[in-house]
Every structure is written in C-alpha cells, then in structure tokens.
Amino acid sequence: MALVLKQYYLACLSHASYLVGDSASGRAVVVDPQRDVSQYLDDAKSLGLSIELVIESHFHADFLSGHLELAAATGARIGYGAAAKGLTDFDIEVLEDGRRIDLGGASLQVLETPGHTPESICIVVYERGRPEPRAVLTGDTLFIGDVGRPDLLSSFG
C-alpha cells in the first residue's frame, strides 16, 4: 500500500488541485480539477490508478473546472457537499459531513465547511495504519496566512 497525494498548482489562478489514491488498490479521486484534465489522466495511467470520483470542494466562481470532462473521460462520479443537492444540471454524488471514502490503503473524510460558499467541504486524507491525517484539502476555506471570503452568493439566485 502506498498513498498517492499529488498536488497540481496553476499559479495564474492560484488554483490547487489533487490526485489522491492508493497504488496497491489502484483506486483514486481528483479534487478540484483544472480545466485541462490531461495531466490527471496521464498521471493516473502512469501510476496504475483508476479515477473513480471527482470531488469539487465548492462551486467555483473564479475559474472553469474540468470536472465534467474528467468524469466523461473516466466514468467517475462527481461529488459535492450536501448543500449542492438539486443545484446542478448533472447528477452528483452527495458528500455529507463525516462521510468516509475508502480507496484501499487510503481514505478520505468529508468535512462540511460552509462559509466561502454554502456547499464548501474540506477533505481529510488518511493513510491506513496512521491515525493522524496526512493532509487536509481545504478548497477555498483556508489560504496561506488568510481565510477564504464568502463568495459571490448572488450568483446562486
């Protein structure tokens, strides 16, 4: 078992996304994908991973996500926090607070963190055999030396 946790950073948009998986089980998720999804597909293939779920930490008003393209290319489901239920034009997997996502030797836990947007979630990354988290993927909830702002809620109605 080996945890895969790879960050992709697009400096011009200050956008971080992640490939998280377990090399033994071959199961993986992508969190907050960039518009160009080829890097996730290429890396997953080279690492022997199958992307099963695309997680959006929140609705992104500041860039175009690649979630639909990545789901189409892989057959992955698209997951959002529970407050997103009924707000998309496509099917989503509702990721409720406390839910655990098992990837084999790695697991993820969903934390609802409304504030930046009502459906914002953070993802806590665990590795089997280690009780403490390896990482917390915070979307736009936390920034280095700052916190996320309540974001453009008027765009939701």
Regions inferred by a protein language model and the residue ranges of each:
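Extreme N-terminal starter segment of soluble prokaryotic enzymes
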Residues: 2-5
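Active-site HxH/HxHxD metal-binding segment of metal-dependent hydrolases
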Residues: 10-14, 25-28, 35-114, 126-134
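Short hydrophobic/aromatic beta-strand element in the GNAT-like acyltransferase core
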Residues: 17
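Metallo-beta-lactamase
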Residues: 26, 107, 117-157
